[in-house]
């Protein structure tokens, strides 16, 4: 056991991705008036909560991770950390993260983090991931919480913008996850995990990807139409979203489903990154947007 194991078991890649969306939500609510001390507290607090959830997930999935090529070398599978130590580590990370959000931000942001944590660890990892094809849908709510946490940490209000962020990022999670399930089809099949491509076929997953990307594109526009983001954000959201939709539609003609799914997955990351950046740098008040339309 080494320091590397303590880092690896938290899934740093997932933490980094969540930090980007937390920042997007935070800067969207800040509207150019950034409290960097608060920002640091929110980023660290959310990262600790996400890390805690990932460690608990490693503990829960240790019996199936050895069956999957992409997870067979995880710390718990290789015996790099004992189960009791991992559980203690996960608990300490969670307590530290929730406490930081509650004390340095506000109870609302800590509550949002708690909801995301319960959904991911309790409903998804412990139950639905292995039992239902709808596990991905339920799990998407946890993946959508980080930008909401960032937004609520500043606004201290669960308003229309927070709802829009929750819907946007939940919808984004679905095609992103289905694409992974397609190019990792053999892994999920070997572990008997009923993701959509395994349970109902790749064609069914392709149809769902197109529908969810379309819904995502429409949802992204609501930040500007609702008066929370500017026209620069709108232009980027529309361009990225429509191209992602074009890629998704191309799945019906794809000769290599795995190759196509990897492209859809890769562009999904570019899309959510671009939107997180733009909603942070091009946030506006409703009055600003209305004045723009009036000119």
Swiss-Prot record:
Residues 29-37, 98-107, 217-228, 288-295 are periplasmic. It is a multi-pass membrane protein. GO terms for biological process: heme O biosynthetic process. Divalent metal cations. Mg(2+) or Ca(2+). One of its GO terms (molecular function) is protoheme IX farnesyltransferase activity. The keyword Transmembrane applies. Pfam families: UbiA (PF01040). It is found in: Cell inner membrane. It comes from the Bacteria. The chain crosses the membrane at residues 10-28, 38-56, 79-97, 108-126, 198-216, 229-247, 269-287. Its main location: membrane. Coiled coil: none annotated. CDD domains: PT_UbiA_Cox10 (cd13957). Its cofactor is Mg(2+); Ca(2+). Keywords: Cell inner membrane, Cell membrane, Heme biosynthesis, Membrane, Transferase, Transmembrane, Transmembrane helix. One of its GO terms (cellular component) is plasma membrane. Belongs to the UbiA prenyltransferase family. NCBIfam families: cyoE_ctaB (TIGR01473), PRK04375.1-1 (NF003348). PANTHER family: PROTOHEME IX FARNESYLTRANSFERASE, MITOCHONDRIAL. This is Protoheme IX farnesyltransferase. The gene is cyoE.
